[in-house]
Amino acid sequence: MTSYAASTPPAQIILSVCEGAEIAAIATGEQYKWAQSALVAAGWERTGNGVYTRLFSERAAAERAISTLVHAARRHRAAVVTSTRPYLGDIADTIAHQLPGPWTPTVEVYSHPVWQEDLVPWLWDSGELIHAVQAGQVTHATRLTNETAGVDLLLIERPGHSTGYVAGAFAPDGFDDNFENPHAPTSIVLPQDPYRAAAEIADRYLPAYHQALHARRTAAVASALSRIRDEHTELQHLTATEPDPAYEERFADMAWHEVLDVVKHAPPLIEHCRRGPLPLEDSMAMTRLEAALGTGTTIVAGWHGMLSGRPDAPRAYLNEHFPGAKAIRNRSIRPVIDAWLADGDTLLRHAHAPGRAPIPAPAAVPALPPAASKPARPR
């Protein structure tokens, strides 16, 4: 549960100076709609991300507009505060352009204090970021997304400090139970200067993030293989004393759910292991695992496609609409299971081995520009 200071106004408007003679306003508080009404009454325009803006051609016009806003805010029982920081969206734009690869910044506004709590299950962090979201008030943030690399970061102003930022990660696709996950990377405290902040993210945070992701993927595959192996051992024991097709069906049903994790998380591990030389026998094992993954991926996609979004459909539904489908699925996936039982330990041994970087070294961050030079804000 997020806690808030008793002195926090029920409705508040936070003003930040943007590039290009623009001022951004964010409405927050348990009665944030009062603040929104004041902004509308004062002639501020709401953007698609929930931020209100006004563009001014001269300082005097800006001062008059802010004075008008203050009076409107009083009528609507809202407080107006001016941030000492530049607009976070501008900072994120600069950082995104300095990071290696294609990054897209997206501003998010959490007007009501409880909205930020929706972030908690999705954040994958063991540092200051998750603490700030849980115990403080985060009125707005910026996502930095690299769809090519599958990395999604969250950037916030550092709570309790007049300068600086904090950046951490959302969990990548394919993972649940992210809260207090033992492999979670630690969010990074960033300097106020966006160019140096980008360098810190590229040089320190992203390598640590990918190392943590590699460890989590390895643990997920190891756990899945361990459960498959335990069930397979029990199957062998049961069928040795009392052969029964029902035992095989039960094993395949259980193993199917573990195969889903293997199909999701093993491909990057194999790619990781292929980055260095392998003994011939191990290389052949990797080739067999890759072939099994290809088959497994096709079976999983076909199964989910057949169910049209009902991957956990009950047996009665399957028997009615797809008689015999599960038995066919189980027979098809059995060679995939056997391949991983035979060669999975080879993958895990190399995945655990030190000496291979989880990702290629990132491209160098561009050199810092002269102090007087500043890129234009994208529109």
What are these regions (language model features)?
Residues M1-R379:
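Compositionally biased accessory segments in Actinobacterial proteins
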